[in-house]
Amino acid sequence: MQNETEDAFSKDQLRPIVVRSLRRSNIRKKIADYLYEISPSGSYTSEIAYNCKTTPTNVIGAIKGMGTRYKKDESLIELEIVELLTSGKDVKIYRLTDLGKEIIDSMKR
């Protein structure tokens, strides 16, 4: 029971940080919006890049963090908005988490 309280508290603390991160990066916002549109399905890097009209390198940076441009602590995975699913032959599929769906839904209102 204590873990449920701690999880809810951490999600509430995380929410403003997530919203700030999405507002600071157009690419992160486009990726989250695209994954929201195709939810509950996921997508792979190059497909996300194609639909967001950016490069796969930018997608990887926004999702995982890369160098100074995309800080790891502000990455979509680190913020628990996106989760990584591995499928078969080294295929990485990214999908929006339930927290990510809640936040994108609230931002669209």
Where are each of the predicted segments found?
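A short acidic, leucine-rich amphipathic alpha-helix
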Residues: E47-N51
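Short amphipathic alpha-helical interaction segments
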Residues: K53-S75, E80, G88-V91
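Short, amphipathic alpha-helical interaction segments positioned at domain boundaries
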Residues: V91-R109
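Short capping segments at the starts of secondary-structure elements
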Residues: I38-Y44, T57
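Short alpha-helical segments that sit at the start of domains
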Residues: E4-A32
